[in-house]
Amino acid sequence: MRIARFATPDGVSFGIVEGDPDSPATCTLRQVDELPWDGQPVFTGKSFALSEVRLLAPIFPTKIVAVGKNYIDHAKELGSQTSDEPVIFIKPPTTIIGPGVPIRRPAASQRVDHEGELAIIINQPCRNVDAMDARRVILGYTIANDVTARDIQRAEGQWTRAKSYDTFCPLGPWIETQLDPSDQDILVEVTHSDGSSEVRQDENTAAVVHTVSEIIEFISSVMTLL
């Protein structure tokens, strides 16, 4: 199931994506009365063509807990080693934007980088979740761009300022509830003003240091996830 959050002239709604998203005119969004946290959508009876709506960030969480250096190759790019335990940091909700919204480069930075990530959406408040039980608290997954002011990150050593500027966390386009997080390609392709494009990031979640279940167990031992 694909869960989207979208805007129409009548307001903001959640909906279930049905059909081929590569054909926006025929792909539809069946409106639901609220985000189906339990995986059981309640339909309102209204439907919209994907081409008729504006997709928004699929969720607006209370906090974004991110994991750094979880890919061996990326850790090498930063000139550091991977860790026996997840390296976590928090991005504020004010970083979140939806698909197609411009990322604003802060005046303090001359180098802003993309970091394509698999984002885990938690379906309930939870604490001290065992890794073997982690699937129970996952609603689904979406795509995140952990935008980073790389020059600031390298100059300061700590990551909070470099990763917390407004617009520094694009999310979407929707939540995928039936997805295997252990084998997903993370591909970032940049399109230039002249129409040309190039692949800037090509990774697979099979290469992570810490799995989704291990990450949930670790973070929920520190703070409540909700």
Predicted regions and their residues:
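A generic local secondary-structure boundary/capping motif
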Residues: 4, 54-56, 77-79, 103-112, ...
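Catalytic-pocket segment enriched in acidic/His residues
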Residues: 10, 48-51, 74, 150-226
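Structural signature of FAD isoalloxazine-binding scaffolds in flavoprotein oxidoreductases
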Residues: 82-99, 114
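Ligand-binding beta-strand-loop-alpha-helix segment within the catalytic cores
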Residues: 116-118
